[in-house]
């Protein structure tokens, strides 16, 4: 059979190249069709002028519970001091046991999530086995590092990786949360929770206080939704539950059975319960604050 693209190298002609390179979809595409990659990852020059007028997405939270992990994200995107979107999806299932949530420049974040999912699927198709969790971390770190030039010009997108390590010796502690910096450095969270985005400080403070209540997936989901509610209370770029429009955070639960999207009806139920409990609190005491 003749290779149909004379202006590009065939797979078999990549002499001297380790075969493992072919298991990376990003590396393969960079060789065969670099124009199909995002400019930052393909090595092209990022747009001048930074990202002052580009939509941004925040906030993402993740927390572990015995036997799994929960990841949730708000729905708001901002453009400077304006709200550019109210129903943005920021949490994606990337394979059977992994999910990513990415905060930052919306366009870059979405490209990251989609390309990472294809990267994992491509590896499994070629090698016949899925990547180990450590391998998944390294692949995402390489992608983040490839975006460094764009990040230095303001097109920053930071992922949060959550997953279930099927090779863990103890299934009850197999939930994993990994955070990344702009240079591709990564850290496996040992505290049991993490957040990224402009509201991450407030979300982490909320989870720190509530984490002792987490005993299973359902209680973990409630704490994640409540953390986003607290973040939205103090961070204008984070959107809380919108009862009027019927817009609620999105969430993924990952355990030994795999990763599943939490139904919107369940998140709405939890959000309403949280708002009702906060609204019902007697802030000023039994006399309403009057003498």
Swiss-Prot record:
GO biological process: modification-dependent protein catabolic process; proteasomal protein catabolic process; proteasome-mediated ubiquitin-dependent protein catabolic process; proteolysis involved in protein catabolic process; symbiont-mediated perturbation of host defenses
Active site (catalytic residues): 58 (nucleophile)
Site, Covalent link with the inhibitor MLN-273: residue positions: 58
Positions of the pro-segment in this chain: 1-57
InterPro entries from the UniProt entry: Ntn_hydrolases_N (IPR029055), Proteasome_sua/b (IPR001353), Proteasome_suB-type (IPR023333), PSB_actinobac (IPR022483)
UniProt pathway: Protein degradation; proteasomal Pup-dependent pathway
Principal location class: cytoplasm
Subunit structure: The 20S proteasome core is composed of 14 alpha and 14 beta subunits that assemble into four stacked heptameric rings, resulting in a barrel-shaped structure. The two inner rings, each composed of seven catalytic beta subunits, are sandwiched by two outer rings, each composed of seven alpha subunits. The catalytic chamber with the active sites is on the inside of the barrel. Has a gated structure, the ends of the cylinder being occluded by the N-termini of the alpha-subunits. Is capped by the proteasome-associated ATPase, ARC (Mpa).
Name of the molecule in the record: Proteasome subunit beta
Biological classification of the source: Bacteria, Bacillati, Actinomycetota, Actinomycetes, Mycobacteriales
